Amino acid sequence: MARYIFITGGVVSSLGKGLMAASLGALLQARGYKVRIRKFDPYLNVDPGTMSPYQHGEVYVTDDGAETDLDLGHYERFTGVSARQSDNITSGRVYQDIIAKERRGDYLGATVQVIPHVTDAIKNFALADQDDLDFILCEIGGTVGDIESLPFMEAIRQLRNELEPMQTLSVHVTLVPYIAAAGELKTKPTQHSVRELASLGIKPDVLLCRAEHPLPDGERQKIANFCNVRKEAVIPALDAPSIYSVPLQYHEEGLDAEVLRGFGIVDAPAPDLSAWDDVTDRYFNPEGEVTIGVVGKYVGLQDAYKSLNEALVHGGLANRVKVNIRWIDAEVFEEDDAAIAAKLEPLHGILVPGGFGERGSEGKIASVRFARERKVPFFGICLGMQMACIEGAREAGHALASSTEFGETEEPVVGIITEWMTEEGLEKREAGGDLGGTMRLGAYEAKLDGNSHVSAIYGGATEISERHRHRYEVNAAYRDALEGQGLIFSGMSPDGLLPEIVERPDHPWFVGVQFHPELKSKPFDPHPLFSGFIKAALHQSRLV
């Protein structure tokens, strides 16, 4: 029988509920329990796939092809449990399914309402796919009081009544602000947030109080008195120097022990946190440092590249070095040629990440050219690989080489994928069709040249599986021209039609991949491509 932990937030958004859920899941896992974490997103989009990165941040893609919230990346990185489509639901998807059923006549003429139809759909999602789990953690997006989240709160209230006693627990994340002028922490926002939650029929069992300054015992007792919880259930959550120290910090404050106590578990095994100790030791005690430039389009919001940022950190952990990331707007290079050398020369590695659209593309191509000519370690991901191929084609004499994503071109080195193979068979897409859910999404296999640099990076593997999210693909018709210029196709789809990896054997480290390796990197198991890239950057740092 799985136990359920419902995680809500109050006072303000962006308190770190996702990180808290991931940390608690990791702590329970360290005690030997099987856990899975799910995310309820109240927005009306069916999924975040068509949302602006500036609005939503990164779209995290699962093995089974779901476009999900970036918090699922935290869940997977902290627990090592692969996220899947059934771990994320939105109001948009709930309503889409309900309206489709109504149109089919599945409700037999009944009036379709928020209660019971919407709340039942949410409950069914929460209860599905238990897989002999010990704990299922459910994070509810947004803030208590948001009108969009009311059906989710009602579904939680019903579940807490319907499930067995001590089978559910509510954790509420709040803010205890510090008023500098008064020199005081203020508990009133937390009190009001708990009162708002209680008005919806949900009494929190544990309060996680985010604060900039230590929470004195007197303030903890005050919160406990006014919010009707034990003092030990008021857990301070101070700002941490690294997200990878958060699980250890929460354990020190007694979060996991208090949660287990809420379920009546008093004899739980002690947690094995040695892996977390090793990660934090490597993070806080590096033996060197490198500087990596990320030349992208959405650098104004680093959450747009959340998994990429973390994967670079993981590469640093693998090599025991600190990774300094410089976020560079690719458009700068289109406006000022002198900026290219000024911004790129100090770097030990250049990375061009995935993205969409023409804006900044010429700046990215200029970055590829700089890395190729100056022999600086280069890593191109998704669109970054496509830019590397366009740059290579231009160098090979195809001056008009471009992508059909950017408009009509006489030299379509990159074009839209019209069909590709999935486990279910051939999947097709028409240009001009719907954007949502129509990309090549999820895990696909690739075959590697056993004599290639990339195969060596993967430990000699000739077959790999990586996650994809793209509509456009390098045109294999240009393979001979590109390989003649030195850009080798070292990885292809199993049917040999879709290029997956390119590399330059005459370069210290030049790799482009069509997939997103950052989505599978973890602090305990850094992705080999990021480990190799940072290792090459470390070597470069010793040359300059």
UniProtKB/Swiss-Prot annotation:
Catalysis: reaction(s): UTP + L-glutamine + ATP + H2O = CTP + L-glutamate + ADP + phosphate + 2 H(+); L-glutamine + H2O = L-glutamate + NH4(+); UTP + NH4(+) + ATP = CTP + ADP + phosphate + 2 H(+)
Gene Ontology terms, MF aspect: ATP binding; CTP synthase activity; glutaminase activity; identical protein binding; metal ion binding
Enzyme class: ligase
Gene3D superfamilies assigned to the protein according to its UniProt record, in alphabetical order: 3.40.50.880, P-loop containing nucleotide triphosphate hydrolases (3.40.50.300)
EC number of this enzyme: 6.3.4.2
Residue numbers annotated as active site: C382, H516, E518
Functional pathway: Pyrimidine metabolism; CTP biosynthesis via de novo pathway; CTP from UDP: step 2/2
Domain annotation Glutamine amidotransferase type-1: ranges: 291-543
Pfam families with a match to the protein in the record: CTP_synth_N (PF06418), GATase (PF00117)
Swiss-Prot/TrEMBL keywords: ATP-binding, Glutamine amidotransferase, Ligase, Magnesium, Metal-binding, Nucleotide-binding, Pyrimidine biosynthesis
Region (Amidoligase domain): 1-265
CDD domains: CTPS_N, GATase1_CTP_Synthase
Binding site for Mg(2+): D71, E139
Positions with a binding annotation for UTP: S13, K186, T187, K188, P189, T190, Q191, K222
Reported regulation of activity: Allosterically activated by GTP, when glutamine is the substrate; GTP has no effect on the reaction when ammonia is the substrate. The allosteric effector GTP functions by stabilizing the protein conformation that binds the tetrahedral intermediate(s) formed during glutamine hydrolysis. Inhibited by the product CTP, via allosteric rather than competitive inhibition.
Comment field (misc): CTPSs have evolved a hybrid strategy for distinguishing between UTP and CTP. The overlapping regions of the product feedback inhibitory and substrate sites recognize a common feature in both compounds, the triphosphate moiety. To differentiate isosteric substrate and product pyrimidine rings, an additional pocket far from the expected kinase/ligase catalytic site, specifically recognizes the cytosine and ribose portions of the product inhibitor.
HAMAP family associated with the record: PyrG
PANTHER family: CTP SYNTHASE, CTP SYNTHASE-RELATED
Subunit structure as annotated in this protein's UniProt entry: Homotetramer.
Record-given protein name: CTP synthase
Organism of derivation: Erythrobacter litoralis (strain HTCC2594)
